[in-house]
Amino acid sequence: MNHERILEKRETILQYCHRLTEMHRAALFDEEESPRNLSLQQLRKNIHICLKDLCRLNTWLTEQDGGFRKALGSLERYESKLAALLAKERQLGEERQAWEAAVPAGAGDDSGGVFTVHGGHQRHLNAYIESMGVDNTGLGKEPDALPRLSRQQALGHVAVLRLAQAAVSREISQAEGLLKSFRKDQTFIKAELAKLEAFVRAQKLAVERELEGVRRSQEHIFRKIGLLKLPAREREPLGLGRRPAADLESMKAQMEEFLHVRKSALKAMLSEHKQETQLLKSQQEVWKEVTTLVEDLEDRIRTRFATAAKVDPVELRRLITDAITQIKSLHYEESYPDVLTCIRDEIAALEKANDQLPFSKQKSITDKLVPVNTGAGFLVNSTSPPKVGLTKSIVPSSSMATNKKSV
């Protein structure tokens, strides 16, 4: 059972004890309001049971594996878990930031990839144009015009053009092979880029999911320690990739102070209830002694009336006075208010009973005394005296003695 449940039960018992105190007073002084279903002796016993139960609950709260120490241990464990979660959150935040980093410097520098193509056919072509003249070639105003050439000139130009044609064909073939290689490289680069970009997205998503799990764990602990009151289903969900709620961030800022206050409060309650346990044990003993003294008095009065035809009121006064003196000698001043009230009510009831006893200095007191009858009245007519053991249940039907004791 956790300390909150124990404290709730303790509060219930305290309220019941207060109600018993009121019933105890009514049973002692108020005949009309006296509880019908509980005797005075049972009320006294129930008050003692309440004190015993309170003592037991306090022991559960303060023992080595009790409620307060368990709560303190839980808070310390939660504090440790939260510290680990916050460290994990910082680490994941840094990791996410690293995945968002720009392309490293120099990655776009392509100066080392310059290709220089040398056109060997240009030499032959330039020689031909220079020999023929630009205007006498297809570059002139009349592309189809052909100057008068000697056989040697014509064959020479043909030879040069054939060399140029062979050279340019070779160079085109080389260029086409290079372009094909470039296109092949392009296809490979696209495939590799798509694969690696998918990998980066997956890694970033994994970091986000892990961050989400960390935040949910934090929220769970905040709810456990009482910093977050609303149940999870009533809170806005923290979706993947979304920023945490503002109140969750606020709770992180309050966490250290909140835990410090909670632990300080639990330690203070632990110390307070440990002291209270000793007080409760002492009060159990005091109340037990009080009820024992009162019930012993009742038994002695009952026995005296059962064994003597007449009883001197002076003897009764002495018995009651002795009981009052013994009760007052007990250390009960620091008792619970309800226990203190019950003890004082017992004393007041005894004193009232003592005051209502006639004095034996008179010549005869039998005229002022009546036999105990079937009613619940006290030994003096027309009174509703306290129930201190001098009612019909204790005193048999007999008369009080005169000045002279009759044994």
From Swiss-Prot:
Example of a GO biological process term: autophagy
Tree of life domain: Eukaryota
Primary location: cytoplasm
Keywords: Autophagy, Coiled coil, Cytoplasm, Membrane, Protein transport, Transport
Membrane topology: Peripheral membrane protein
Positions of transmembrane segments: none
Location(s) in or outside the cell: Cytoplasm; Membrane
Coiled coil, from the record: 74-101
Gene Ontology CC: cytoplasm; membrane
Family membership noted in the UniProt record: Belongs to the ATG23 family.
Role noted for this protein: Required for cytoplasm to vacuole transport (Cvt) vesicle formation and efficient autophagy. Plays a role in ATG protein retrieval from the pre-autophagosomal structure (PAS) and is especially required for autophagy-dependent cycling of ATG9. Also plays a role in regulation of filamentous growth.
Protein name according to UniProt: Autophagy-related protein 23
